[in-house]
Design a protein with these regions (language model features):
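Poly-acidic low-complexity segments
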Residues: 7, 26-27, 52-55, 110, ...
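Intrinsically disordered, low-complexity regions enriched for glutamine and histidine
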Residues: 10, 19, 73, 120-123
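Membrane-targeting and insertion segments and their boundary/processing signals
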Residues: 16, 30-34, 72, 106, ...
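Short, well-ordered surface patches within globular domains
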Residues: 20-82
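Low-complexity, intrinsically disordered flanking regions
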Residues: 1-19, 169
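Disulfide-stabilized extracellular recognition modules
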Residues: 78-81, 89-169
Length: 169
């Protein structure tokens, strides 16, 4: 029998703006939602809240713009920071959605083994206790939305999962 994913706690409700509107105000609200949802989910695991790093915001925004301009979905080659990426098409996206999608990978993570799992890498980076700061970027084109989050120090370090990816409290 397939396991049903756990419900994701909604951090808030909001009416999404019009699709494809890549305005500064829309992006600031969106990125605040990304940040708030990230810290809410980390808190459920007893992990400290991340702080926003302006340089990581810039790096994440540049990569989100690059992905939009290439119409691609790929990780930055040889990143210095942890990175989660998200692409959605055909629907309005709020800032909590990408974070909640990454969090759903909890279903693929084995807390007993406490090691990297390719199907849970976004979740483990999101929760990684040793990460202290983050930066996010969002880019839109037509009905597509790209989201990039960078984390410092990076997570998913071999041999450190047991100490950095705690189960829910």
């Amino acid at each position: 029998m397939a396991r049903k994913p756990p419900p994701i706690p909604k951090t808030h409700e909001r009416t999404p703006g019009p699709r494809g509107q890549d305005t500064k105000a829309n992006n600031e609200l969106f990125l605040q939602e990304v940040f708030n949802t990230t810290n809410k989910l980390r808190g459920m695991h007893g992990c400290p809240a991340l702080t926003i790093n302006a340089e990581l915001n810039k790096i994440a925004q540049e990569w989100a713009n690059h992905l939009r301009d290439k119409n691609a979905m790929e990780h930055r080659p040889n990143p210095k920071f942890g990175e989660n990426i998200f692409l959605s098409g055909g629907m309005d996206v709020t800032g909590d959605l990408p974070v909640e999608m990454w969090y759903r990978e909890i279903n693929s993570y084995d807390f007993q083994k406490a090691q990297f799992a390719p199907t849970a890498g976004h979740f483990t980076q999101l929760i990684w206790k040793g990460s202290k700061e983050m930066g996010s970027g969002v880019a839109r084109k037509a009905d597509r939305t790209w989201v990039v989050c960078n984390y410092n120090p990076p997570g998913n370090v071999v041999g450190q999962f047991k100490d950095n990816v705690p189960p829910k409290k």
